[in-house]
Amino acid sequence: NSRLSRTLANWLLPWLKTPSENTHNMPSKRINNAIRLEFSSEALVQANISGAAFSGECLWIAGDEACGIDRLRRLDPSGTELLRFGDGLSFPLSELLALPGAADEEADLEGMTVADGYLWVVGSHGLKRKNVKNDRDDAENAKRLAKVTLDGNRRLLACLPIEMGDDGKPCLVREAKDGRRARRLKGDAESNLLTQAVADDPHFGPYMGIPGKDNGFDIEGLVVDGNRLLIGLRGPVLRGWSALLEI
């Protein structure tokens, strides 16, 4: 696992390829330590990968625009790549948890880690601002830039039980046979216990109403260390200083 993690950190994606794509769509030059990820056309996560974690020979993958997690299995290399993962299986979050937002609303998962038989996941928790579009005039784009929204599922911090399926591969379940259950931090589509606590923080509180892309509050990573959670922040960056939150 440590070797896989180091290789993953070197990163990873000279290409993303679904089995239906032709080989001529792949880059002509492959980088050293490349890892090949193969996704079916039905996979919940196929692009915009934002988080990854290992369980043995399997790789859990999350994406910016998905409301679910895909599990890829380690396969024999088919070319010059160092590692290859495919044979995916999708796990919609709505089948595992009562979500704060709608079942089809993106969760923007940004951090994943495996600890004590659970897959921990965290959303960005950030607001988003509408972007300009080339086919709109200045007045329309000005209105778009003034619109700030929140997808409720972004405010998700949860742990999902990992259990071996009948095929011997790890699966995510709502409730495991040993009694472990999927759980999420208490809250709704507007806030949770984390955002309520941060709102009173002198450093981060003033940034809770600012979209993530504008240096607002924006979670980007997650580590479980015993009884502590370490949450990495993409923003805000304060005078060049980034931060970790310890829970």
Identify the role of each PLM range.
Residues M26-I247:
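Sequence/structural signature of beta-propeller domains
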